[in-house]
Amino acid sequence: YAAVKVLTSSICPDDKKRYANGILSILTGEEEGIPQEYRWGAIGAWAWAGSRCVDYLETQPEFDAQKIAISGCSRAGKTALWCGAQDQRIAVVMSNVSGTGGAALERGKIGEHISDITTNYPFWFCKNYAAYAADEDAMPVDAHMLLAMAAPRPMYLASASVDVWADIQAEYTALRLASELYTLYTPGLILPERRPAANQPFHIGRIGYHIREGIHDLTFYDWTCYMDFCDSYLK
């Protein structure tokens, strides 16, 4: 394997005051007539950069462009899911402790809510996301739909056992709901109703998942699980 890092600070600064100084100063959405409330935030810009990396890798003979995976942790986990959802060239979609705005269902979620994330990081998302801060149930979509957009490609999610802010149950429930679409490609695929114990990863059909013992983080254990999953599909 080879690793390619997307340096987000060079694309769109992760800063409430400076985020529009990067690529968003050029790709404003104004020319396309996109209303202000629906225009990209930083996560959209970072995901765009991920696809531009794929563009480059396709031109380099030392890489197999049919075997590209994407991953990220926390805000980068949200980004990986969004990039993977939009770019079908990505063969394996992986995300680590992505929580609100990522793999976790908004409805019934504990820990971080839309009101929290849009107060602390309003620039990550389009402005319309904050319209559901007071009524998450009114949002017409939820995380399982984002996850399902990876199908039929292999998808791997990871949570952390004491990551209450991300809500591991909301992440796992979204994964189970998304798996219903995967049954169109893998008949009989059924994920366990109860989430697995910590450090007990599973691969079922084209879906992988684990809960790592510990806090909101990305560790060597997580990478080991990701590589084991990729071995099944990319080697």
Where is each model-derived feature located?
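Alpha/beta-hydrolase fold nucleophile elbow
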Residues: 62-74
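Cap/lid segment of the alpha/beta-hydrolase catalytic domain
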Residues: 1-62, 106-107
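C-terminal catalytic histidine-bearing segment of alpha/beta-hydrolase fold enzymes
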Residues: 130, 175-235
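Short glycine-enriched nucleophile-adjacent loop
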Residues: 50, 58, 77-88
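Mobile cap/lid helix-loop segments that gate and shape the active-site cleft of serine hydrolases
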Residues: 30, 95-146, 171-193
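Active-site loop->helix "elbow" adjoining a glycine-rich segment at hydrolase catalytic centers
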Residues: 42, 74-77
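Conserved strand-to-loop "acid loop" that flanks and positions the catalytic carboxylate
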Residues: 151-168, 212-215
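Short, proline-enriched alpha-helix->beta-strand connector loops that line the catalytic pocket
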Residues: 149-155, 203-207
